[in-house]
Swiss-Prot record:
Binding site for L-aspartate: E176, R222, H449, R490
UniProt source species: Brachyspira hyodysenteriae (strain ATCC 49526 / WA1)
Free-text function comment from the UniProt entry: Aspartyl-tRNA synthetase with relaxed tRNA specificity since it is able to aspartylate not only its cognate tRNA(Asp) but also tRNA(Asn). Reaction proceeds in two steps: L-aspartate is first activated by ATP to form Asp-AMP and then transferred to the acceptor end of tRNA(Asp/Asn).
Family named by the database record: Belongs to the class-II aminoacyl-tRNA synthetase family. Type 1 subfamily.
Full protein name: Aspartate--tRNA(Asp/Asn) ligase
Main localization of the protein described in the UniProt heading: cytoplasm
Length: 586
């Protein structure tokens, strides 16, 4: 038995006169004076079907009992709607199907929420009934675009000579960075597998094994606290190459990225993408993932305010802190309440306050202007290029606090002043991150990325003497202020790798225990190698203009790492625990 001969949402006036068989779910049912109209939905959209007793009394009688989300199959002829019934807002709005036969395939209970877009339903309810939520057009469209984007990655990477190779899901735990998800081994009592946080080590092994261009659509797992753009399991397009320098590799990735956006969205991206080194990104935008859809850059005002009597600035300069400013062009429209809200906001990032000055036709005005000489004020106006109607914001603190506070305030002000063009796609590379950062909690240095990242060649000489000044040969791909991918050149010299481990406090025994097979492999002619990984969930979220990656994942977890539909994680039987040589402590 054939249920359907066409998809509902793609029928047009070109199909008028054709006999068609359709199947799907009842979206809406309307009874207009004895003629019953039903919007029949499938994954492509919906079409209006008409039950007229003059065409089929039996089908009309059956349609009396139809309710929302009943599953039916119908046969009928496509005809043009009368002019007054045309709906230009939908693709099928010029046609309707006159039903000759109907088969009821299944009934449905009343859904707990409307299965339409623009619904005001809590996310918890949607996730509990995800099998219903998936029927909504926006959800399907997001997942279909994800499929298209993933397919485009496969096509363009394959066209560039990359080979799809699977790497193990069960591996040993190498506790660096986030916590591992652990899987107990039944056959090896007391031993555990770890689910991969990334295929990093295995893809380097593939390069040593002679696979010079690898990719994989890889499932990765991290046991970390969640937020809007994080999940315990996530998907990345994992990529590695050998015998390519950074410029060559980034050029390939730019072309792959541009081709994907062109194929899926029809948008031409200019290449090459702009590049900013990490230090310039922080100095200009206060962020290592800057949103460049608008200006509003940070301004160094230290020389302009030097010699002023404002204690906050004087103390900052005396303690060798930094002072930076944002010039909110047209900020005169911001109220005192807005300024107070901004002051509270920067406090989240450690700022002890937010100084401000309005620019009027009389010059600078605020309760702190009296502490600045006319010369100071003149220099502030010059260096900030401030004009009447602008509003200046200042933070004076350590570099970390100042950049974090103003970098985030920059985004908040841009939203408030409507400076962001939501239709823009601004890609850029942020390169040469610090190789190490200081962990104040652990009181030691740690790897900014991972312990296999190579330093830039010119900084190898200071690797042991000034490690915190060493730049890494790394690159992050940023889209509209969000990191969507990142990677770098890898260490392929076992001697350099040993120095890195030593600096990180990983002794020879510990290194061998965690990474022994990679360290052994590096001794057998490892080639120069580099790579990166794109976060598919985040890529799709941004291109689809969604606020959360949960909107672009078929079965997402909540911020507590739970699946509300299936009820995982869950308890297991005592017998299962015994087989795994485990017991639960109360």
């Amino acid at each position: 038995m054939r249920f359907k001969s066409a998809y509902n949402g793609i029928l047009t006036k070109d199909d008028i006169g054709k006999e068609v068989k359709l199947a799907g779910w009842v979206l809406r049912r309307r009874d207009h004076g004895g003629v019953i109209f039903v919007d029949l939905r499938d994954r492509t959209g919906f079409v209006q079907i008409v039950f007229n007793p003059e065409i089929s009394k039996e089908a009309h009688n059956d349609a009396q009992d139809l309710r929302s989300e009943y599953v039916i199959s119908v046969e009928g002829k496509i005809r043009a709607r009368s002019p007054e019934m045309i709906n230009p807002k939908i693709p099928t709005g010029e046609i309707e199907v006159m039903v000759e036969k109907m088969e009821l395939l299944n009934t449905s209970e009343t859904p707990p929420f409307l299965l339409e877009d623009d619904i005001d339903t809590g996310e918890d309810i949607r996730l509990k009934y995800r099998y219903l939520d998936l029927r909504r057009p926006t959800v399907f469209n997001n997942l279909y675009k994800r499929f298209q984007i993933t397919n485009a990655f496969r096509k363009h990477l394959s066209d560039n000579g990359f080979i799809d190779v699977e790497t193990p899901i069960l591996n040993k735990s190498t506790p660096e960075g986030a916590r591992d998800f652990l899987v107990p081994s039944r056959l090896n009592a007391g031993d555990f597998y770890a689910l991969p946080q990334s295929p990093q080590i295995f893809k380097q092994i593939l390069m040593i094994g002679g696979f010079d261009r690898y990719y994989q659509i890889a499932k990765c797992f991290r046991d970390e606290d969640l937020r809007a753009d994080r999940q315990p399991e996530f998907t990345q397009v994992d990529i590695e190459t050998s015998f390519l320098n950074t410029d060559e590799f980034l050029s390939i990735m730019e072309n792959v990225t541009a081709n994907i956006v062109k194929d899926v969205y029809g948008i031409d991206l200019p290449t090459p993408f702009p590049r900013l080194n990490y230090y310039d990104a922080m100095e200009m935008y206060g962020s290592d993932k800057p949103d460049t859809r608008f200006e509003l850059k940070l301004i160094n005002v230290e020389d302009a305010v030097r010699g002023c009597d404002f204690a906050v600035f004087k103390n900052a300069l005396d303690n060798k802190f930094i002072i930076r400013c944002l010039n909110a062009k047209g900020g005169e429209k911001l109220s005192r309440k807005d300024i107070d809200d901004f002051t509270k906001y920067v406090g989240i990032f450690g700022a002890k306050g937010l100084a401000w000055m309005r620019v009027t036709d009389k010059g600078l005005e605020s309760n702190i202007v009296k502490f600045f000489s006319e010369e100071n004020q003149k220099k502030i106006l010059e260096v900030t290029k401030a004009e009447k109607g602008d509003l200046l914001f200042f933070v004076a603190d350590t570099p970390k606090v100042t950049f974090d506070a103003l970098g985030n305030l920059r985004l908040r002000v841009a939203e408030k002043l409507n400076l962001i063009d939501k239709d823009k796609l601004n890609f850029l590379w942020v390169v040469e991150f610090p190789l190490f950062e200081y962990d104040h909690k652990e009181k030691r240095i740690s790897a900014t990325h991972h312990p296999f990242t190579a330093p830039v060649p010119e900084d190898v000489a200071i690797l042991e003497s000034e490690p915190l000044k060493v730049r890494s040969d790394t690159y992050d791909l940023v889209l509209n202020g969000n990191e969507i991918g990142g990677g770098g050149q890898r260490i392929y010299d076992s001697k350099v790798q040993a120095i890195i481990f030593k600096l990180l406090g990983i002794d020879e025994e510990k290194a061998k225990l965690r990474f022994g097979f990679l360290l052994d492999a590096l001794k057998y002619g490892a080639p120069p190698m580099c790579g990166m990984a794109y976060g598919i969930d985040r890529v799709v979220m941004l291109l689809q203009k969604q606020d959360s990656i949960r909107e672009v994942i078929a079965f997402p977890k909540t911020q507590k790492g739970q699946c509300l539909m299936s009820g995982c994680p869950s308890t297991v039987d005592a017998d299962q625990l015994e087989e795994l040589h485990l017991s639960i402590e109360e």
